[in-house]
Each structure stands twice: as structure tokens, then as C-alpha cells.
């Protein structure tokens, strides 16, 4: 190899590493820039994701369930979930604690042992069924041109305002308070939407129900076809039970009696009940006083004080629907006559019955106004005395005026603590047993006439009463209610649907339980 060629080779070899280094240096710069950009994007995405996660974005923007054509966000599902829980709470009241442990999360409390379903699952299901029904009615209302009344819209605004007041008290804003109560993603906007849906649905359902009107001919035809459904019976009843043939410490005068009660077989107890019931029915036929006397003689010693009253066995104006089938069928038999007696066996007791009378319920129902002075604890005599004084003062004010229904109504608007103040304290077509006993007895007093006034006391406080007028025939009201109920139920089933829904596993993750 010549000297020149060797020199050139060394130059090429020296140049090669330099070129490689230049190439390497250029790739590192580009890669570094790319990596920085990718990392920046990832960081932004992570920040945005966690913001969306913690701010309730997913709870208010994803789909958790679908009812009909409506996609419900997790936040909307939360509202119906809480609504289902509230419905049960209203139904059970103080007994709710016997069903659900308030100190344990609902998704940790089993509702159905066989399926493993929790109470959280139950309320989710009930809430979504309610949502399906509500949105179906909401859509029907929209299609029918039904809108919220001014009062209904004002009620929604009032609920929002109340939450704003609570929020202010707790040092937060309205949406923050709503989220705290109902769950992440819940805010003032979607809560108002929820209220508008359920309020319009309820309003439309109520308007539809009230819209079913019936003619006198329709009412008469229904009564003629089903008189047992609308008549009432008065009768006497005595129950023969196992306890009457077993020794009980409360029914013996022997203080030294320590022996256990004699144990009788089921067959022996049944035979004894049959014997007593059949004898009492046979011995008291056509003799109401004999029935009263034998009830007293046969009852437990611990019940003697109760059965000393003639009214102990009396059942007045009972409807067929309020009785067991066997008892109702005998009492409402077309051939039943006053003084008829019988006995009817059930699994646990024997009914001894004495038929008194049957009524066609063809009397008028009372329309009554009242002014309530509410007392939270009616055992508090100081509070009751204050309420009595106020009631007497208002009655005096009424009597000093023109003493009309209208003037009483104006006083009711001013003074009553009842929710019907805007209607002048008026209750129309009051059904027997609709009101508490004292209120009911005053309304249905046989001597009551329009213009009568009085003061009564109930568990609600002190009432100033005014008998306004007589309303519908009771029988006709019963028939109307039955027809309306049947027609409304048919309409509701057809309009509200079957409560079907679908859920999205991803969206349901963001619901609050």
C-alpha cells in the first residue's frame, strides 16, 4: 500500500467516528424534544382526568342509565335513588331503624339473602323504575301540552331557595350543598331539572285522575251491578282463641300458682274453640243483649274491663273491602236478616258473628271548615291552654261578625296552622274515618247542621270548627272513587309503562350510594 493511500485511509477512519457522533448528537436532541412534548401531554391528560374525576364531571356528563329515550347521568340516578330511599323512610317512619342500619353503608347490608342483593341495589332498582315511570309521564305531559302551574313552578323555586339557605348556613354554595346531600356531580342545574321532571309528571297524573268525570247514570249502573262493594254493615263480633283455654298468670287469683299451663294439642284446642263458638252462636240468635252478655262471660279475665262496655263487640258501618272474605261473604249475603248469627273458623281463631243491619250509605257527606291552633305536644297543658285561648278568641271574633262561611274562611286564611288555609280551611265530602276520631265525631254528629260552630281538641292541637254544608251522597262518592281509581290505574299502566331501564357499568361507577 502506498504512503498516500495509507494516509487517506487514516483520514477516513478518523472522519467516521466524528460523523457517527454528529448523527448521535442530532437524534438525542429530537428525541428529547419529542419525549418532553409527550410527557407534557400526559401530565395535562392526567391532571384533566383527575380534575374530571374529583370535580364530578363524569357524574354529570356520562350516561349511567337509560329510560325510554332519556339518558340519565349518574347525578340524575342519584336523585331518584335518594327519592326511593325517602319514600321508604316516609312509609316506615321510626320503624325504619328496624329494617335498615343507618350506621352501615347500604351496599354492605344484604336485602335478599338468596340473591345477595343489597339495600343499595334495591334502592337503585326502585329509583330507576320510578325514573322510567316519571319520564314516561313527563313525555306524555309535554306531548299533551300540559305545563307547570305558577304554584308548581313557585314550589320548585322555593325548594331551591331552601337549599340555598342551608348552603349559606354551612358556608358553601347551593351546588356544593346539593352535592353534599345527593352525591358528586349533583348541582343546582341538574337538581332543578330533576324537580321539573318529577313535578310535571305528578302534575299531569293528578290532572288526568281528576279529569275522569261520571254521570249519574254511570254511577247508578255501577252500584246496581256491585252493591256489596258500596254498602256497609253493622255487626257484633267475638273472637274465640286458644288463650281462652290455657292457664295464664294474669287470669288466675292464685298467687302461688307456679305450675306451667296445661299443654293442649292442636286438635284439643280446635275442638274446644268449635264447641264454644257454636254454642254462643246458637244461644244468642235474635238476641243482641245475650250476645253482649256472653262475650263478657267468655272473655279472658284481663279483658273484662273492656267487655264491660257494650261497644266492645260492635263493628259499625264496615265496608266489604275492609273485611276478610269469609266474614264479608256471610255479612253481605242478600238474605241476611237482623239477629242472624254464625261462627267462622280460621287457622288461629273462631269468629262468632251477630248481624245487626245493612246500610246503602245513602246519606250526605259533610263539608267542614276549621281553624287549627297547632300544639306539638298535647300533653303540655301550658301550650294547650294557650291554644284554647286563641281558639276562643277567634270564635268570639267570628261571632262578632256576619257569621257566614266566607267570614269564617277569611279567619282560617289568617290564623290556621293547617295547610288548607288558602282554601278557607275547607274540607269537602269528608269520608267516615278520614279524620282523627274527635274531628270525625264532630262532623258526623246526627244533629249537625250548616252554620254550627264549636271547639274540639285532637292530637294536632285545638280546632275551631264550622259546619259549612252537606255534600255528595256517600254511596255515590264511593262509586265515583272506585270508577276513577280503575280508569286512572288503566291509564297510568298504559302511559307510565312497565318501569324498564338499562344501565351502563361505566356510568354507574360514578353514582353515590
Model-derived features with residue positions:
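N-terminal targeting/tethering segments
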Residues: 56-189
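Sec/Tat-exported extracytoplasmic proteins
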Residues: 81-84, 88, 131, 135, ...
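Charge-rich, solvent-exposed alpha-helical interaction surfaces
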Residues: 98, 122, 159, 177, ...
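Peptidyl-prolyl cis-trans isomerase
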Residues: 275-327, 393-437, 468
